[in-house]
């Protein structure tokens, strides 16, 4: 410590017998004291515990350094605060470097701090523990904040020093495992400005948008090599820890060696023991992925083949259990063919009979006979000279003309209606044959000048015949036959049983009626004597 001498020592000397002692003003004594203190303590280092720390709106910081016996007021000007590598906190033991100055307005003295550092590793550990607990209480280290890393990031952002083995190890390991595009944000990783620079880099990566000139990374790696606690201290700073916790991109922290742990590791989504390990955690091994895909492809093909084979076997089993469609429909097809043939024969017979009747009546309605009869009647009427008779003849002739006209219209209507009915039946039952026969009938009718009364009667008869044929066709339907009391016999496999011999070979038979089915068991009837004179079966009447 520098020695000093007080020029105003005569102030302390006893006054002599005379009264010529000089009187100093307060300002003079305060100024003399200020010069003495500032000259004697212009550069000193003071160790103590911080208390009463506050930061004014101007940026200046005010605090006090204390020990067990004394308290020293101190101040840190705004320009010095930005150069301090940590945030001062109450209870922190520090070593302050600066100068003493006095404040004459209140007869106080204070230490103007120009440099501030933590006093020893123990104090650093205590500060680290307090900071860790504070940030943990805020939830920055909660497990639910951790995000899963992307499986195969296309772009990886690295925040580290551009020079050194760290970035080389990361790039080399990524190239070996799975080549990936890497963007390096160069920052200092040690010193007073390291924490702020690294935090700015993390926030800069998070601020990138899709489509920017610099592509947005899918994953961030904050990396630094090993070192002492003081060397790694920037990664314990609150500004950096908060930047990592608030990052919108998943972050891997790879600071120091495996035994080194920083607050950045707690805030990151994943901690890697070394920068090389961070590269291994960031990307998978490409060769392992290829082998895995090949294995999955092989397993998928085998599974598809097994499933196809199993489905084919099941389909074949179902096909064997299903009855044959042709065998199911054979009885109905045969019955339909029989009924169709019978209906065709019946229609042919009816048409032949109708043709004979038509020829018979057509012979009686010859135009020559009609003309001769009309001539005779006209001659007879002409012979009558009575005016009244002539008027009657004229009136009757008019009535006859009206009736004739109406009969012609009715004849045409009935003929059209019959034509439609015949066309409908022709479409159902051999259209070509019916059309030929109908054409013959039409030509024959057109060749004859028929009486309207006879034509109308014939048309009525034909209409009845057609209606009767239609009813016969309906009665020939299989469902109509069942409704009359008949039943269709089938075995357990839905096969038709058509004789008694086959029925005896089955244990159960299915009797199908028009309104349902009944399962029965055939039994052998007891032997009985034949009737001497069995009744003859009644003659089957024709529906036609």
UniProtKB/Swiss-Prot annotation:
GO terms for biological process: DNA catabolic process. It catalyses: Exonucleolytic cleavage in either 5'- to 3'- or 3'- to 5'-direction to yield nucleoside 5'-phosphates. Keywords: Cytoplasm, Exonuclease, Hydrolase, Nuclease. The keyword Ion transport does not apply. It is found in: Cytoplasm. Pfam families: Exonuc_VII_L, tRNA_anti_2. The keyword Hydrolase applies. GO terms for molecular function: exodeoxyribonuclease VII activity; nucleic acid binding. Residues 522-544 are annotated as: Disordered. Heterooligomer composed of large and small subunits. HAMAP family: Exonuc_7_L. Bidirectionally degrades single-stranded DNA into large acid-insoluble oligonucleotides, which are then degraded further into small acid-soluble oligonucleotides. This is Exodeoxyribonuclease 7 large subunit. It comes from Zymomonas mobilis subsp. mobilis (strain ATCC 31821 / ZM4 / CP4).
């Amino acid at each position: 410590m520098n020695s000093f001498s007080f020029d105003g020592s005569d102030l302390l000397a006893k006054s002599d017998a005379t009264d010529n002692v000089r009187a100093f003003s307060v300002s003079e004594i305060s100024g003399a004291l200020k010069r003495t203190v500032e000259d004697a303590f212009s550069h000193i280092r003071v160790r103590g515990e911080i208390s009463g720390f506050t930061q004014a709106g101007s940026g200046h910081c005010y605090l006090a350094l204390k020990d067990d016996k004394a308290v020293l007021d101190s101040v840190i000007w705004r320009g010095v605060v930005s150069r301090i590598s940590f945030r001062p906190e109450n209870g922190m033991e520090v070593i302050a470097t600066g100068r003493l100055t006095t404040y004459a307005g209140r007869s106080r003295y204070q230490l103007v701090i120009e440099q501030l550092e933590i006093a020893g590793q123990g104090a650093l550990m205590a500060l680290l523990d307090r900071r860790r607990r504070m940030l943990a209480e805020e939830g920055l280290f909660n497990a639910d904040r951790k995000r899963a890393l992307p499986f195969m990031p296309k772009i990886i952002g690295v925040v580290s020093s551009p020079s050194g083995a760290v970035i080389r190890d990361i790039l080399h390991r990524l190239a070996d495992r799975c080549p990936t595009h890497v963007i390096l944000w160069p920052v200092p990783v040690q010193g007073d400005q390291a924490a702020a620079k690294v935090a700015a880099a993390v926030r800069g990566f998070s601020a990138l948008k899709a489509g920017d000139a610099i592509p947005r990374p899918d994953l961030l790696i904050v990396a630094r090599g090993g070192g002492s606690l003081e060397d790694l201290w920037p990664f314990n700073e609150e500004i950096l820890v908060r930047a990592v916790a608030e990052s919108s991109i998943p972050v891997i922290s790879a600071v120091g060696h495996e035994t080194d742990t920083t607050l950045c590791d707690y805030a990151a989504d994943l901690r890697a023991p070394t920068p090389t390990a961070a590269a291994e955690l960031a990307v998978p091994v490409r060769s392992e992925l290829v082998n895995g895909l090949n294995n999955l492809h092989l397993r998928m093909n085998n599974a598809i083949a097994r499933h196809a084979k199993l489905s084919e076997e099941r389909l074949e089993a179902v096909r064997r259990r299903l009855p044959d469609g042709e065998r199911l429909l054979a009885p109905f097809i045969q019955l339909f063919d029989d009924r169709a043939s019978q209906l065709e024969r019946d229609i042919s017979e009816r048409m032949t009979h109708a043709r004979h009747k038509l020829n018979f009546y057509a012979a009686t309605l010859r135009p020559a006979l009609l003309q001769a009869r009309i001539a005779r009647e006209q001659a007879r009427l002409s012979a009558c000279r009575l005016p009244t008779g002539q008027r009657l003849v004229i009136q009757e002739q008019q009535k006859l003309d009206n009736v004739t006209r109406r009969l012609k219209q009715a004849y045409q209507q009935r003929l059209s209606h019959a034509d439609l009915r015949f066309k409908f039946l022709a479409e159902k039952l051999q259209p070509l044959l019916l059309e030929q026969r109908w054409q013959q009938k039409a030509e024959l009718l057109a060749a004859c000048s028929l009486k309207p009364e006879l034509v109308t009667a014939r048309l009525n008869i034909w209409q009845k015949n057609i209606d009767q044929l239609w009813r016969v066709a309906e009665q020939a339907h299989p469902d109509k036959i069942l409704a009359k009391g008949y039943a269709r016999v089938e075995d357990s496999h839905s096969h038709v049983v058509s004789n008694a011999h086959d029925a005896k070979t089955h244990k159960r038979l299915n009797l199908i009626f028009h309104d349902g089915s009944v399962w029965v068991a055939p039994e052998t009837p007891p032997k009985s004597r034949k009737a001497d004179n069995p009744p003859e079966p009644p003659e089957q009447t024709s529906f036609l």
